[in-house]
Amino acid sequence: MGGISIWQLLIVALIVVLLFGTKKLRSLGGDLGGAVKGFKNAMSSEEDKKALEDTEAAKTAQTTQQATEKKPESNKEQA
């Protein structure tokens, strides 16, 4: 008592199919699937962008660090 049984779920599903029809439910399912796929693609492209930006930032930091390390050596040679 208090829980939803399998029979109650089947009756609700049958009523939904009778009200909307299988074609409309199929197109609704396809639209929902397309929306989920688009959302996943957008999320993965955002992750790719962040990874690319992080990689570029690391390269820039490494280049800057190397340039900074080379400057004191050139100053020592001049003195």
From Swiss-Prot:
Segments traversing the membrane: 1-21
InterPro entries to which the protein is assigned, alphabetical: TatA/B/E, TatA/E
GO BP annotations, alphabetical order: protein transport by the Tat complex
Annotated Low complexity bias: 58-67
Bias type Basic and acidic residues, positions: 46-57, 68-79
GO molecular function terms noted in the UniProt entry: protein transmembrane transporter activity
CC terms in the record's Gene Ontology section: TAT protein transport complex
Membrane disposition: Single-pass membrane protein
Disordered: annotated segments: 43-79
Highest rank taxon of the organism: Bacteria
Key words, A-Z: Cell inner membrane, Cell membrane, Membrane, Protein transport, Translocation, Transmembrane, Transmembrane helix, Transport
Matches recorded under Gene3D superfamilies: 1.20.5.3310
Subcellular location: Cell inner membrane
Function: Part of the twin-arginine translocation (Tat) system that transports large folded proteins containing a characteristic twin-arginine motif in their signal peptide across membranes. TatA could form the protein-conducting channel of the Tat system.
Quaternary structure annotation from Swiss-Prot or TrEMBL: The Tat system comprises two distinct complexes: a TatABC complex, containing multiple copies of TatA, TatB and TatC subunits, and a separate TatA complex, containing only TatA subunits. Substrates initially bind to the TatABC complex, which probably triggers association of the separate TatA complex to form the active translocon.
Record-stated family: Belongs to the TatA/E family.
The protein's name in its UniProt record: Sec-independent protein translocase protein TatA
Originating organism: Shewanella baltica (strain OS155 / ATCC BAA-1091)
Name of the encoding gene: tatA
